[in-house]
Every structure is written in C-alpha cells, then in structure tokens.
Amino acid sequence: MQTFLIYITTRDTSQAREIGRYLVESRLAACANIFDGMNSMYIWQDQFQDDQEAVLIAKTTQVRLKDLIEAVKERHDYECPCITAMPIVAGNPDFLNWIAGQVGE
C-alpha cells in the first residue's frame, strides 16, 4: 500500500475546510490539515502575484489518489489549482495502516 501527502493551496481557510471535509467524509482522504496565512508569490497571466492563501494537506493512498485530485478540481475555484502528491517513504506503520483503513483499503 503506497500512501501520499497531498499538498493543496486554496484561496482561504473557508475553502480549505470545505474541500478537506468533503475529502474526509467521502473517504478519499483519511484526514486533512489546514495551515492558514501562507504567503504565495508567483506569476499568473504575466502578472506578479503576492497573495495570502491557505494550505490543505490530505493523506491518502494510491488507489484513491486520482479520485481525490478530481474531487479537489471540481470544488476548487482556481482555474489551475495546486494539487501535488508526495509519496510517504517511511512512517509509523500503525498510522500508515490507519490511513489505508480510513480510505477503504
């Protein structure tokens, strides 16, 4: 069972909470963590952006990953939302098994 941390940026904590709750309640993610007040700097449509955003981190497995990404895209208001998956290469086996159990593996 391969587990992942999914890093997602959102416009604010309200959107992060909405998406995170959906992911957990629909068993696409075992849990979600939200960090408020992140500063993001980037170029979008040839304009420099310096924005305040929130970060949503979800934990899931390979089996649920594709559906999780699609669910976030459907609920996100950004045209091109940041949704990246990072494999968990090691960790507490009990916690990793809990993740798998929560998402139905």
What is each model feature region?
Residues M1-E105:
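Positively charged, small/polar-rich N-terminal and surface patches that mediate targeting and assembly
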